[in-house]
Design a protein with these regions (language model features):
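Canonical Rossmann dinucleotide-binding motif of NAD(H)/NADP(H)-dependent dehydrogenases/reductases
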Residues: 2-34
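Catalytic loop of short-chain dehydrogenase/reductase
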Residues: 12, 16-17, 93-95, 112, ...
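Short C-terminal tail/terminal secondary-structure segment
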Residues: 17, 98, 201, 210, ...
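Conserved mid-core segment of classical short-chain dehydrogenase/reductases
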Residues: 72, 80, 93-110, 151-154, ...
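C-terminal substrate-recognition "lid" of short-chain dehydrogenase/reductases
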Residues: 82, 122, 136, 214-240
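A glycine/serine/threonine-rich, flexible loop-to-helix segment
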Residues: 102, 171, 175, 182-217
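Catalytic Tyr-X3-Lys loop
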Residues: 102-122, 133-140, 162, 209
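Short, small/polar-rich loop/turn modules that mediate ligand/substrate recognition or access, typified
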Residues: 174, 179, 233-235
Length: 244
């Protein structure tokens, strides 16, 4: 699943979940990684330091990908450092407002909706011209399993909007050599420590002994989609199941 010398932007890559594991796994396969974060500077630097200590290249970039200026800042830094972006992972999403429909706040719900689709819209516009020119690109979004909706109505609507936005874009992008795919998990637990995330990424015994879906499960499939092996997969919605 080599991604040797590809440049990957992973948004929301400094948390304890999927984004961080995706960044680590893409680096494991040879990609140069832009580790995006909003507030978690120390955790972002931890990811970068680990990648570099293992022979890879990575940078941490603070940027709010829910707004146009933040997306422009992120990609500008990526271009200055690596000259291109081949892979972009749309990971972070909306807030959490699980209020019942009769009392939910429409203003907050609309904010949730915008936060789910804004990163894809802004980053797609910034990245597709270069990807089209090179006839190679990968866009992958983290959405939500349609059969495992959460208690938060606006969160569910936002994830559905992101999923549909990506699905409606894939055919046009495919004609230019760019694949667009969506990952649709249900609940996914976080890793308790950075050490645990590394152990899973390196397929140590914790990986083979796992009892439920983990951030690394998502990272492995995302990395496959971003490799040459995933060249002929586009428009897919890949679900992950959670053992209750």
């Amino acid at each position: 699943m080599s991604s040797q010398d590809k440049v990957a932007v992973v948004t929301g890559a400094a948390g304890k979940g999927m984004g961080r594991s995706i960044a680590l796994t893409l680096a494991r396969e040879g990609a140069n990684v832009v580790v995006n974060y909003l507030n978690s500077k120390d955790r972002a630097n931890e990811v970068v330091e680990y990648i570099e200590s293992n022979g890879g290249r990575a940078i941490a970039v603070q940027a709010n990908v829910f707004v146009k200026d933040g997306c422009e800042k992120l990609i500008d830094v990526a271009f200055k450092q690596f000259e291109k972006v081949d892979i972009c992972i749309i990971n972070p999403g909306a807030g959490w407002h699980p209020e019942p429909l009769d009392v939910f706040d429409p203003v907050l719900a609309l904010e949730d909706l915008v936060q789910e689709i804004a990163p894809f819209f802004h980053l797609m516009r910034l990245l597709l011209p270069g990807m089209y020119e090179r006839k190679w690109g990968r866009l992958v979004g983290i959405t939500l399993h349609p059969m495992q909706s959460s208690p938060a109505y606006s969160y569910n609507v936002g994830k559905a909007a992101r999923l549909q936005a990506m699905h409606l874009a894939y055919e046009e992008a495919w004609d230019q050599g760019v694949t667009i795919n969506a990952i649709a998990p249900g609940p996914v637990s976080h890793f308790e420590s950075f050490k645990q995330a590394i152990a899973y990424c390196n397929h140590e015994k914790e990986w083979s002994q796992r009892k439920n879906v983990s951030p690394q499960d998502i990272a492995e499939v995302v990395t496959f989609l971003c490799s040459e092996a995933g060249s002929y997969i586009s428009g897919s919605i890949i679900p992950f199941m959670f053992k209750k």
